[in-house]
Each structure stands twice: as C-alpha cells, then as structure tokens.
C-alpha cells in the first residue's frame, strides 16, 4: 500500500519554480491534495471496513414447515436456545455465544457435544435449571459458509459498481489532474527553458546592479524634481551637503543632466557622482546581460511553453467536465439497503436476499465532498482559460517599467518569453521590473561605462599617449565598450583616435580639451551631447571617419562649420543599396581637403557644395570604375586632384576645366595612352603630374607644351624610352621613371639644370651619360636594379647629392671621387657592403662622419 506522501509527490515541483505558479495553480494544487486525501481515505476504509451483510427473504409463517428439512425438527428447535445460551469463563465474566446464522442443522447421527464444544458445559446448567425457552427469530436453515457465499455474491451483483470503485477512480482522476498541472515543469523541451529562465531571473533579482540601477532611477527623478523646485525660486536654499553625499546618482546622459548641490556660502552646480560597483559584481552583471540576451533570442523563437500550458489547462477542464457528468448520476445510486437475486436457489434454497452496505453513508458523503471539490477545481480551470484567451499572453510590454524608470529602451518581448513574464507577474511584478533592467541597452551601457572608468584611469590613459609623426600628442583607443571619462581630462591631447567603439559617446567634458584639433572615428558612430557638439563645431580642424555603411557616419559630421579636412573611408555604393550617397556638405563652409576612399561609380554631386572653398580632392576607388566625372567641372578652386584606382583608361576631359589645378595624381588606373596631355597646356598652374602605376607605353612629344611642370612621375609603367621632349621642361625638378623598360638615358638630360631628384630604379640602363652630371643640383639619384657596370668619376660634380642608390647593378668598385660629394653620407648611400669596402679609407671615414658633428662642435 502506498502512502499519501508518495502519491502527493506527483504534485511537487522544485521550490524555485514557485515564481511561475499563479494563485490558481497553487489553489488547484491544494485542492488536488485534498482530493487525493479523500480518495486514499475512501480506499482505506473500503479495504478495511467494507462489508455487505445479506439475509434471505423468508416465505410467510404458514409455509415455514414446508421449508424445514425432514427429520430434524426437534434438533433445530433446540439449536437456537443453545446458541443464545450464556456461560461464564474462567474469569467469571458472562459471555454469549452469538452465532445466530453461523450454525448448521444438527443431524441425529452426530452427538450434540461434538457439534458444539460448549454444549458440554452449558447442558448440565440447563438441565439443572430445567428451563425451556421458545425459539426466537425465524429459521433460515442456512450454514455459515452459505451466508459468506451469499454476501460475496451480492457484493458483486447487487451493489452498484460505483460504490465499489469510487475510491480508485477518484485516485486515478486526481493523479491525472496532478500530472496535468505540472507537466510543463517536467517535459524536457519546456523544462530546460523554464529552468534557465528561473535561474537567470533569480540572479537578476539578486544582482547588485539591479538595485543600483533602480536607485539611480529614483535619484534621477528626485534630482529633476529638485531642479524644478529650485528653478521656481528666486533665492537658492542653503541645504546641508552631508545628505547628498551618500545618495547615488546617474551618469550624464546624451542631453547632460546636472544635479545641484548647495553649500552654506553659495549654490554650486555639480555633475552627480557615480558609485563604482565592485569589480566582481560588475563582471557578474555583464555576464547576466549576455545570458539574458542569448536566452531571449532562444526563447522568443517559439511558443511551445504557452501552447503546452494551454493544452494542459484544457485537459484539466475536460477532465473536470467528464468527472462531474458521470459522478453526479451515481450519488443517488449509493444506498444502505439492496435487494439481491443471485439465482442460487439450488444452493441455498432461497431466491431473494435483503442486503445492507455498511459503507454506503460514508461513501455518499465522500462522493459529495469530492464532487464539491472538483466543482471548485473546475471553476478555477474555467477562470484560467478565460485568463489565457482574454489577454495576449504572447506579447509582453514593459511600458509601465519604461514610464517609471529612465530605461526607456526596454524592448517588448513575445512568444514564450512574454508568457513566462506574465506568469511571473502573477507571483510578484517586482521580478519583471528588475529583469527588465537587464533587457535595456542603456542599462548595459551604464554598467559598461562604470566598469570602463574603473579600469581606464587617468594614469593608465596617460601611459598610452604617444607622439605621432607630426610630433603631436596622440591617444589611440581600440575595441573598448565606450570612451572612458578620464580621456577628457587629457587637456593637452592633440589627436584622439577611437576605433571599433560602437557605443562611443562624447560628453560635454570634451570642451576641456582645448588643444584637440584632430579626431579619428574608425567604425565608431559616436554620439555627442549638445555642448560637446558646439565645442567640436568651433575647434575641430581634421576629422577621419572610417565606416562600413554610410549610415555609420554621424549626422553631426556634416555640421562642423570650422572643419578644414575630412577623410571618409568606407562603402558608399553597396550592392544592396545603389542610391547610397553623402548628405549635404553645405554646412562645411571652411572645408579645404576632402578625401574619399570608397567604391563610387560617379563623383558625388554633393561635393559641389564645397566647391567654392575646396582646394584638394582625393578619390580612392578601390578598383571600381569611375564612370561619371561631370561634377569635377564645378571644382574650379581645386589645386590638388587625386583619382586613384578608378579604372580610368584615359585622362578625363573634365580635368581640363580645372584652371587652378596645380597637382594631378592618376595613380593605379588603366591608362594606356596619354595623347590628351596636350590639353594640359591650358592649365597654367599645373606643376606636378603623376601618371604612375599605369600601362603607358610612350610619352607623347606634346608634353613639351606643359612648360610649367616641375614634377613628373611615370614609374611602374611600360616605357621603353624617354623622348627628348621631356628634357625641354626647363622647370622640371623631379623626374621618376622607375620600374619601366628604359635601356638608355638620352644625353639631353643635361638640359635639366633645375633637376634635383632623378629616379631610374628598376630599368635596363647600362651606361650613364656624362651629360647627367651636368645636373649639378641633383640631390637624389636612384640608379638601383639596373645594368650599370661603372660609375663615372664625374660623380664628384654632384656636390649637393644627399642620396645615391646603386644597389643591384654590375659594379665592381666605387670611384674615390665620391668623397667630393660632401653632402653624401653613408646613410644616404644605398650600395652593397663589399662595394662600400672598395672605397679608400679616408672616403669611408668622410661618409661615416655625422652631418651634425660640425654643428655640435660649434655649440
């Protein structure tokens, strides 16, 4: 036999799951326990006390002799007297042998003493008293075993089946209801989600960050109220400062909120301070944010928990209706008296028996109690169904939490996640409020901000400040959760680089950085406060923005009216959005340099907004063919133009309209012919032409018309010779024809009296003409990776030479006349070590002498 505790364990759940048990589930659990007790009590009573006692229905007295077995009349008349006789036991107590229906008829062949053991002691007493009693009751002439047989037969035939099986049915129904109530806690696919949810919910509820976030919200509200009250008064109140020191306060939001703190002397405005969480608590809180984010993504995908709860509620309701329908019909069927016709007349001599059921009254009361309990249970099930279908439980809104707190970004959730939160609200709404804190990105960012400021102190940031190539103080922050507050205390910083900081916020404190003129935002769509924007608008001179999509460019970038240089690096023409473009640049009134590295198919028309004052335009197109360049015609004030990696095949005609153009760079295109170069004669200010890294095979003679050229770059092309027209450019100072197929240097090179830099590296030159050394102003002469066999002694005429490259040639020695190149030092001489060793000792010593030595001696 099982105990109540063993069966009731079906209704047990983990204590932590109680937060998901609304009042109706708890009430139904208790009702189920009561029904279980009723069923077990009824079953126990039935097993131990249940009896049916039957008596035959005797014929009328006139016919009684007809039913008396012949030859036994005398004996049977004496048996009743003997059966009701009394005797005293050894202790002197009087007992009565009550076996009215348990004796059998005595036959003449069997002694009376053998049939009744007590007759030996009772008969002498009876004979002594000589009392003769008349028989009482009516004779049935049935044996004890016959009565037992009849009782058993009538128990199964005359007794209604429900009277016999009610306890077992009640037990089975109750167990089914218990299992149905808690099946969603046991089913693996839902149990795992519920377990994770309860675990995360408990940690969120106990997290110090939840308490701190809620207290900061309350503090913010009180600060705002204080500001409104203070603003309405003409005179400041003198408030003790001790009460404000212990209260937590929120960090500065996007629109700066400052709290007021008054001293006894005068009111002082202060930014509320922030208490730093313990490092361990901060790490745990950050882990909770990650867990909540992953759990939400996992649970919101399905509504299995909701459907299972609805199904089990429907099952319980159907079970209630079924139980109520068939049990109500059997209440009146349970009675104390029953008429039994077992058809055993051939065994007992009687056809009809009158029976009594001793448990009838108890079973009837228990059944009525069970029906009453199941009715209450059913009404609760109906209420549960009403609640399930009246409210959209697959949607949960944190609107009330958003109104009561500063976390207005707490998202609404759906499906199983929403249903679980609705269930928690039936237990305690405070759980959902605290849980919502971990769904807020604002809350997570605040936590990151606290941890970040705790980790990146002023001293640590000072250690990361370095000097860049322009000798400016530079700080580079990479892959942080935000911008530490201590950064804005580095007032002497010139350059600030923020890379891969998606939640970067620039507060008003940046106005302290009076030396800041250059800002780099690499995949960092920074947000700025109004005060910070005003400072950047007036002081920022150079801005670098690197992005993946044009949407990552902060909107405030286009409003920096004092910006001088803007560098945009990213995708401005993605495959999914062909119409992507820059916003209006009209507000950039002082922009001088615009650098765009992207994949444009046409020059953005918005660039014309800055045409009146733009002096340098750079477009690096990363191999995407630039088809439309008509907008360039409007860039009348551009002095420097770079169109690199634009897959240009010819020099664009739009360039010839740029009358103020001084430098043109068409690097890394697909230009093969430059016959249009004659049109450059109209660009009177053009001094530098860079056509390097193309596929040019020849320089047309018409280049001689571009008389103002001072720098000419044709490196990394396919030139095989240099036309004499090049050497008619008397103003030429730099000529770069490196990495071509040039085999000879024309003697006309001596005409370039102003030539200072000559680069012929990576060609096939084997002889250096003597006329080359007439270019006495040469400072750089790169002759590496050629076929030169000897270096003429006239190298001594190049007294201003500071760099000479000879590495990769066929030289076997160096002339001693190198010593007469007084400006040339070993650091500027690029040659093999064995060739350097061929120089005389005094020449090597002269080359090894530091240029700064004479100046050092003179100090």
Curated annotation (Swiss-Prot):
Intrachain disulfide bonds: 54-355
Localization: Cell membrane; Endoplasmic reticulum membrane
Report each LRR repeat as a residue range.
515-535, 539-560, 562-583, 590-610, 613-633, 637-658, 660-681, 685-706, 708-729, 731-752, 754-775, 777-798, 800-821
Compositional bias, Polar residues, is annotated for 228-252
The reply on keyword Lipid biosynthesis is no
Q: Which InterPro entries match?
A: Leu-rich_rpt, Leu-rich_rpt_typical-subtyp, LRR_dom_sf, LRR_domain-containing, LRRC8_Pannexin-like
Task: Give the transmembrane region(s).
Answer: 23-48, 165-183, 310-331, 362-387
Q: Which UniProt keywords apply?
A: Cell membrane, Disulfide bond, Endoplasmic reticulum, Ion channel, Ion transport, Leucine-rich repeat, Membrane, Phosphoprotein, Repeat, Transmembrane, Transmembrane helix, Transport
Q: Which residues lie on this side of the membrane: Extracellular?
A: 49-164, 332-361
Q: From its record, what is one biological process in GO terms? A: cellular response to osmotic stress
Kindly report every residue range on the membrane side named Cytoplasmic: 1-22, 184-309, 388-859
* Cellular component per GO, a single term: plasma membrane
One function term, GO molecular function aspect: volume-sensitive anion channel activity
Per the record, residues carrying Phosphoserine are 242-243, 247
**Catalysed reactions, as listed in the record:** chloride(in) = chloride(out); iodide(out) = iodide(in); taurine(out) = taurine(in)
Which residue ranges does the record annotate as region Disordered? 110-138, 222-252
Record-stated family: Belongs to the LRRC8 family.
Domain-related comment: The volume-regulated anion channel (VRAC) channel forms a trimer of dimers, with symmetry mismatch between the pore-forming domain and the cytosolic LRR repeats, a topology similar to gap junction proteins.
Function per UniProt: Non-essential component of the volume-regulated anion channel (VRAC, also named VSOAC channel), an anion channel required to maintain a constant cell volume in response to extracellular or intracellular osmotic changes. The VRAC channel conducts iodide better than chloride and can also conduct organic osmolytes like taurine. Plays a redundant role in the efflux of amino acids, such as aspartate, in response to osmotic stress family member (LRRC8B, LRRC8C, LRRC8D or LRRC8E); channel characteristics depend on the precise subunit composition.
Its name, as the record gives it, is: Volume-regulated anion channel subunit LRRC8D
């Amino acid at each position: 036999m099982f105990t109540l505790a063993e069966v009731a364990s079906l209704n047990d759940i983990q204590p932590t799951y109680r937060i998901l048990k609304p009042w109706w589930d708890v009430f139904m659990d208790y009702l189920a326990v009561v029904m279980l007790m009723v069923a077990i009590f009824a079953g126990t009573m039935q097993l131990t006390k249940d009896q049916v006692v039957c008596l035959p229905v005797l014929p009328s007295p006139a016919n009684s002799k007809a039913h008396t077995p012949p030859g036994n009349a005398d004996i049977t008349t004496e048996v009743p007297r003997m059966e009701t006789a009394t005797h005293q036991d050894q202790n002197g107590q009087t007992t009565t042998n009550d076996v009215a229906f348990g004796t059998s008829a005595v036959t003449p062949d069997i002694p009376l003493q053998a049939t009744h053991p007590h007759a030996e002691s009772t008969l002498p007493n009876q004979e002594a008293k000589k009392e003769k009693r008349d028989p009482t009751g009516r004779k049935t002439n049935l044996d004890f075993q016959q009565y037992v047989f009849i009782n058993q037969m009538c128990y199964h035939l005359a007794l209604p089946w429900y009277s016999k099986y009610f306890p077992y049915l009640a037990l089975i129904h109750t167990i089914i209801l218990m299992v149905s109530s808690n099946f969603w806690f046991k089913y693996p696919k839902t149990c795992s989600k519920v377990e994770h949810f309860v675990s995360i919910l408990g940690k969120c509820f106990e997290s110090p960050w939840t308490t701190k976030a809620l207290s900061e919200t309350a503090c913010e509200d009180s600060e705002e109220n204080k500001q409104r009250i203070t603003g309405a008064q003409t005179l400041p109140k003198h408030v003790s400062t001790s009460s404000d020191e212990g209260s937590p306060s929120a960090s500065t939001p996007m629109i700066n909120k400052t709290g007021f703190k008054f001293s006894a002397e005068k009111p002082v405005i202060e930014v509320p301070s922030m208490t730093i969480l313990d490092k361990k608590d901060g790490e745990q809180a950050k882990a909770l944010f990650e867990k909540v984010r992953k759990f939400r993504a996992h649970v919101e995908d399905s509504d299995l928990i909701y459907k299972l709860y609805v199904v089990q509620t429907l099952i319980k309701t159907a079970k209630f209706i079924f139980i109520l329908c068939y049990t109500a019909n059997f209440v009146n069927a349970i009675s104390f008296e029953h008429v039994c016709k077992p058809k055993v007349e051939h065994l007992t001599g009687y056809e009809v028996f009158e029976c009594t059921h001793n448990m009838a009254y108890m079973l009837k009361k228990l059944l009525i109690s069970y029906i009453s309990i199941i009715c209450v249970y059913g009404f609760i099930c109906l209420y549960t169904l009403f609640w399930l279908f009246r409210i959209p439980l697959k949607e949960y809104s944190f609107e009330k939490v958003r109104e009561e707190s500063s976390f207005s970004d707490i998202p609404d959730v759906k499906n199983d996640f929403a249903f679980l939160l609705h269930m928690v609200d039936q237990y305690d709404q405070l759980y959902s409020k605290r849980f919502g804190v971990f769904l807020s990105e604002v809350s997570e960012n605040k936590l990151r901000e606290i941890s970040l400021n705790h980790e990146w102190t002023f001293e640590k940031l000072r250690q990361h400040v370095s000097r860049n190539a322009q000798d400016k103080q530079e700080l580079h922050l990479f892959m942080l959760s935000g911008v530490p507050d201590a950064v804005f205390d580095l007032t002497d910083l010139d350059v600030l680089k923020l890379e891969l900081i998606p939640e970067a916020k620039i507060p008003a404190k940046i106005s302290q950085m009076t030396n800041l003129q250059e800002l780099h935002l690499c995949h960092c769509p920074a947000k700025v406060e109004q005060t910070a924007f005003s400072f950047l608008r007036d002081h920022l001179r150079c801005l670098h923005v690197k992005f993946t999509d044009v949407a990552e460019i902060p909107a405030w970038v286009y409003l920096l009216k004092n910006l001088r240089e803007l560098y945009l690096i990213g995708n401005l023409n993605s495959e999914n959005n062909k119409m992507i473009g820059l916003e209006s640049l009209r507000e950039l009134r002082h922009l001088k340099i615009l650098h765009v590295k992207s994949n444009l198919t046409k020059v953005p028309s918005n660039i014309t907004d800055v045409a009146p004052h733009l002096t340098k335009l750079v477009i690096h197109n990363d191999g995407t063919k630039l088809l439309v360049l008509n907008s360039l015609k409007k860039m009348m004030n551009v002095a420097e133009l770079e169109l690199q990696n634009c897959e240009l095949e010819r020099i664009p005609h739009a360039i010839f309209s740029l009358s103020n153009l001084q430098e043109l760079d068409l690097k890394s295109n697909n230009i093969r012919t430059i016959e249009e170069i004659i049109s450059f004669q109209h660009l009177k200010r053009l001094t530098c032409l860079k056509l390097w890294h193309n596929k040019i095979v020849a320089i047309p003679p018409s280049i001689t018309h571009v008389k103002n050229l001072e720098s000419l770059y044709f490196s990394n092309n396919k030139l095989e010779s240099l036309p004499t027209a090049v050497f008619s450019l008397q103003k030429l100072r730099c000529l770069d024809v490196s990495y071509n197929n040039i085999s000879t240097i024309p003697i006309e090179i001596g005409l370039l009296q102003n030539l200072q830099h000559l680069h012929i590296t990576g060609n096939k030159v084997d002889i250096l003409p003597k006329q080359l050394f007439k270019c006495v102003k040469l400072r750089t002469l790169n002759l590496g990776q050629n076929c030169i066999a000897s270096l003429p002694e006239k190298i001594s005429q190049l007294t201003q030479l500071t760099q000479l490259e000879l590495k990769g040639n066929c030289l076997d020695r160096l002339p001693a006349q190198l010593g007469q190149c007084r400006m040339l030092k070993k650091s500027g001489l690029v040659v093999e070590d064995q060739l350097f060793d061929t120089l005389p000792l005094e020449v090597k010593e002269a080359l090894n002498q530091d240029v700064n030595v004479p100046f050092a001696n003179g100090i």
